[in-house]
Amino acid sequence: MSLNHRGAAVLTAAALAAFFCMPPALAQSQFEEDFDDTGKTWQEIALQLPATPSSENLIPFYVSPTATQNFALDEKSLSIGKDGVIRYTIVASSPAGAKNVSYEGIRCETFERKSYAFARADGTWARSRRDQWEPIVRNAANRQHGTLATDFFCESKSISGNRETILQRLRGNQPINTRSGG
């Protein structure tokens, strides 16, 4: 009986050894699959346009000494989507008083921007005819997208902080990297 008992113990030990050796290998392959982005395509979430901005909700931000317009972001419209897009309404004002209001998005991961809609005088939105993702230009006279991305929204291809952190940076004119703006 002790031989059978010993045989069962050896068999159990062998089974346990096999069991404990296999899961790490399986776990490793699952771990690698979880981070394998090849073949996975990014998908943008459905868009909900915000209300057009009120002047009391606008946060002005500095773009550059060569900017030909002044810019402000509507704090009520700022959102961070589950798709990794920061969406916001921006108001561009010329020295003569003309205003352009647009609802836009920035993807930190790809350093791209997109215009979703433009405000009409009656407070409604007109969808952009060119709603494609485009590279952000940092060296134009009006480089508001580059300023928002590098100074307030993005760091190392990731969103830098949550909604409230970004709003605090904008309100205090405290860029992420003090050498790049402010």
Which residue stretches match the model-derived regions?
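Bacterial N-terminal signal peptides that target proteins for export
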Residues: 2-12
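Bacterial N-terminal signal peptides
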Residues: 11-22
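A short, surface-exposed interaction/processing loop segment used at functional sites
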Residues: 110-136
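N-terminal secretory signal peptides
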Residues: 27-103
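A short, surface-exposed beta-strand/turn
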Residues: 102-112
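Short, flexible beta-strand-to-coil junctions
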Residues: 90-98, 108-109, 118-121
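C-terminal partner/receptor-binding element of secreted or periplasmic proteins
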Residues: 126-182
